[in-house]
Structures are given as structure tokens and as C-alpha cells.
From Swiss-Prot:
Taxonomic lineage of the native organism: Viruses, Duplodnaviria, Heunggongvirae, Uroviricota, Caudoviricetes
Class of enzymatic activity (EC top level): oxidoreductase
Protein name: Phycoerythrobilin synthase
Family recorded in the similarity comment: Belongs to the HY2 family.
Species, as recorded: Prochlorococcus phage P-SSM2
Listed GO MF terms: cobalt ion binding; oxidoreductase activity, acting on the CH-CH group of donors, iron-sulfur protein as acceptor
InterPro entries named in the record: Ferredoxin-dep_bilin_Rdtase
Keyword Oxidoreductase: yes
EC number from the UniProt entry: 1.3.7.6
Keywords: Oxidoreductase
GO annotation, biological process: phytochromobilin biosynthetic process
Catalyses which reaction(s): (3Z)-phycoerythrobilin + 2 oxidized 2[4Fe-4S]-[ferredoxin] = biliverdin IXalpha + 2 reduced 2[4Fe-4S]-[ferredoxin] + 4 H(+)
Length: 233
């Protein structure tokens, strides 16, 4: 009996339990409805906290590499524990068109600490990228240095878990603008050195090491940062 080839397509969710467990599902759906070509090509890791620490024992991580037309890769990670729900993705476009990445950090650390960040992250150092018609940041979030791989349009909001979808329409607008960049330029280059400075900077900036070490141990934490999150440095 011939199998239906449609059944062999990679899922657009991380695993069978993912859809019912994340508060970020509407954002994830919007992302892959905008870029349906980004299919899972590698399941990089599926971890649980095991016995690393008492605090980390209930933590679970899934990390995927996605590939698709006009993109070198999109790498996504989803981390959950009884309090946290964190979804992180960066889309790396193919090179030759001087385009930014698109990055999103959707972070629920507790019911009192939820942070939404998405932005056009340009690989060029000391270059202030901006898009007309989108909100502009006022610079109050000093952690994100506009003009150094973060754009003038970086979107940062703190909210409560039941408020996250209030910013979904803005997120979709950013996605629409980014899709226009990709569709208009259709990048095809594969020079990963273009992203060397970007990944080096993000490695130094990213605060995930301490969190990951606590949840999954030092070895896994270092591998996650260096071999998965920022592998082009």
C-alpha cells in the first residue's frame, strides 16, 4: 500500500505535546504561516533536566534546525518547566543581498515575568537598520544596543501571560515586512562568514548560559550556545 506523501512532511510544531503547552502558539503559527518553506531538517536536541539540579529536573528542551528557500537556516528552541515557557528563533537569510536576520525571544519565566522581543537583526556591526512604518524603540532597554545588530525597530514588551496576544498583530506586521524583504531580494548566497561577527556578538551578549547550566548542566549549556544557537562564529 502506498503511503500518502503528505504524511511524511515535518510537523510545524516541536512535538505532539507542544501545541497544548505553550502560550506562544499563535506567534509560532504566524511565523510558519508566513514562511511555510521552513521545514524541520534536523532535530538537534530533545533534553530533559534529569538529575542535574533539583530546580532543573522538570525542564525540557527541544531544539530544531529548519531550512527552506532563501534561508541558510532557522534555528528554534523551546524550553519549558513548571514556571517557564521560552521560545527562541533566529531566521538566517541566504547571503548576497545584505539582509537582516529576524529574531524572536518569547520568554515567560514566571506569571510575573513575561518578556516579548522581536527584531530585524542585521549581521553588519555598527549599522543602524530601520524599516519605515514600524514602531521605533526609544532606547530605554539598554541591554539591546540599537545599531549594533539590533535595529531601530526592536520591539520589547513586558506583560502578563494572558496579555501576550495583545502584541500579535504587531508581530504579524513585522513578519509581513520581513517577507517583503525576502521576496523582493530572493537571496541565494551561502557565505556563512557573513554571520561570524553577529554570532560572536550574540554569544557574548546572550544570558542563556547561566539558565541553561542550572537546568541542563554545564556541558549541555556550552554545546547549546556554541554549537546550536551561534554556530557561525
Amino acid at each position: 500500500m502506498t503511503k500518502n506523501p503528505r504524511n511524511n512532511k515535518p510537523k510545524k510544531i516541536l512535538d505532539s505535546s507542544y501545541k497544548s503547552k505553550t502560550i506562544w502558539q499563535n506567534y509560532i503559527d504566524a511565523l510558519f504561516e508566513t514562511f511555510p518553506q521552513l521545514e524541520i531538517s534536523e532535530v538537534w536536541a530533545k533534553w530533559d533536566g534529569g538529575n542535574v539540579t533539583k530546580d532543573g529536573g522538570d525542564a525540557k528542551l527541544t531544539a530544531n534546525i529548519r531550512t527552506g528557500e532563501h534561508f541558510l537556516k532557522a534555528r528554534e528552541a523551546h524550553i519549558v518547566d513548571p514556571n517557564s515557557d521560552i521560545y527562541n528563533t533566529i531566521l538566517y537569510p541566504k547571503t548576497g543581498a545584505d539582509l537582516p536576520c529576524f529574531g524572536m525571544d518569547l520568554m515567560k519565566f514566571s506569571d510575573k515575568k513575561v518578556i516579548i522581543v522581536f527584531d530585524f537583526q542585521h549581521p553588519r556591526e555598527k549599522y543602524l537598520f530601520s524599516v519605515d512604518g514600524l514602531p521605533e524603540d526609544d532606547g530605554k532597554y539598554r541591554f539591546f544596543e540599537m545599531g549594533n545588530h539590533f535595529s531601530k525597530n526592536i520591539f520589547v514588551r513586558y506583560c502578563k501571560p494572558d496579555e501576550v496576544d495583545q502584541y500579535l498583530d504587531t508581530f504579524k506586521l513585522y513578519l509581513t515586512k520581513y517577507k517583503e524583504m525576502i521576496d523582493n531580494n530572493k537571496p541565494v548566497g551561502e557565505d556563512t562568514t557573513v554571520y561570524s561577527d553577529f554570532d560572536t556578538y550574540m554569544t557574548e551578549l546572550d544570558p542563556v548560559r547561566g539558565y541553561m547550566k542550572n537546568k541542563f548542566g554545564e556541558g549541555r549549556s556550552e554545546a547549546f550556545v556554541n554549537d546550536f544557537l551561534f554556530s557561525y562564529k
